[in-house]
Amino acid sequence: MTLAKHWKYGKDEDIVVTQLRGLVASNPYVNLIPSEKVVFNPHSDTSKKITIISGGGAGHEPMHGGFVGENLLDAAVSGSVFASPSTKQIMAAIKTKSNKEKGTIIVIKNYTGDILHFGLVAERAKSEGYKVELVIVSDDVAVGREQNKMVGRRGLAGTAFIHKILGSASATSPDVDLKSLSDLGHAINKNLVTLGASLDRTSVPGKLEEEIEFTGNDEMELGLGIHNEPGTKIKPIPNIDELIQKMYHQLLSPEDKDRHYVDFDFENDEYVLLINNIGGTSSFELYAIAEHALANLPLKRKPKRVYVSDFVTSFNSPGFSITLLNLSNLKKEDISFTDEDVLKFLDTPTNAPGWKPKIYDSEIWNSQNKEIESPMKNETLTSSDLKIDGQKFESQLVNALKVLLDEEPKITRYDTVVGDGDCGQTLADGANSILKALKEDDDFKSNLNDPVYTLGKITEYVEDSMGGTSGGLYSIFLTALVKQLKQTKEISVQSVGDALYHALYDGLFKYTRARVGGRTLIDTLQPFVDALHKTGDLTKAVEAANKGCEETKNLRASFGRASYVNEEEFKAEGGIPDPGAVGVLALIKGFTEKL
């Protein structure tokens, strides 16, 4: 039996304590009681404020220890992986930070073990003279009332909101009493809804793979719990918009009586949106998911705040959750705080490392129009008095691009072996953008007889559509070529050869050290330019380009990611030519065969 893939730790090591020590080592604002797994803020003056304590099983980091800090938690206690801490541990947290006069609020998620252990400690603490109130977070909508009627909704990412709101309220409202603050916590919880979606179960360090029922290919789970509790399996995996629409329906639809927990006025209600990384979703995808979540919101008003980060996780679970807090409903609650107070508490700065969103004031949040037009949009391209046969040039250009597209599968196959596999697609993106422009851009098509203007437009399309190193090289070379053509008095094979020569040697070579022999696109481009400049003979120039490309089969890469590939890979199939060199050769052959 093999272990799920994780780093290996000492056989007898308590990895929970180890990670808490790492947290404390990186955060000088907190201290640790390692024997009890309690992280606490020694700087918070609990003689003047109500103490906010939380805790639960490990594996949901940054919850709970990562939320200890100014204007957030005063202490957090961790159990073992996915297991509630003991009553002894919880009592240690209370005795470390609680003040008998001001009182303590304990925030926990709605799981049986947490309720039993924290509830028992709350009663024990009361018997010793402490004032203690429990706020139990239950924001999940995945499980309906009928199924959870004995235990209630699970606590998920909405817990982070309650931590932040109660922590800030306690720190900034020294005169608030314990009941008023706990009432705020209950009111927030009452108006929270959360639903998660995951591509797979989480892999727990030290747990055998055979003990985890992973999802199948092209399968996901909606409502998968943060302890691997089964959700509803969906196959095939839907498009992200379709998935998010389904999630919003489950979060908000009043038609689903079994799962409709919070009323929303779709036209008028104010709310806060939180997109939570359950652990294994990249930041890249998480922000993309957030944009789709915003685009598909069925609520008319924009959210008052948008938070995107990892708040409540489940190790490396490749999923996300959506949380909505209805602010407008708070006006109907019998509490001492307003919805504006709640936003103020969310905006209060904190040094807790787990609360990663930057803090902005209300004025900044209210300035919603964040997208502007590019200053490049209306730039006027340079035109010239040079003239060519525009119709013939278009025919040559289209042929060159089509030859390149025909070669794309081969280029991609070569680059998959000796590079990172993106060269073919990058070139295809550039080719397709130019072909599209020839159909849709009237200015481009009507000025094909002006080589300066035309190459300027082609450079624009290349810059916009081609990323990576090859995109940069093509863009610089074409920009330099435009500059040279502006200084040319007439178009001929020789004058174009001279312009290409100076664009290469005085332009592109200023920004790259790649030369013939380095196994790059230069191995095709440089021989072609040199031969055309020297002889003015297009046939000889094409032959030189072909020879240069062929010789890359025997070269070891010196530049780019290919320089890290084992030499044996280059010798496969009798030698693999450089993909970039093949691409340039395709363009040269395609363009010149129509002359």
Spans of model-derived segments:
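N-terminal loops that bind phosphate or other acidic moieties
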Residues: M1-L595
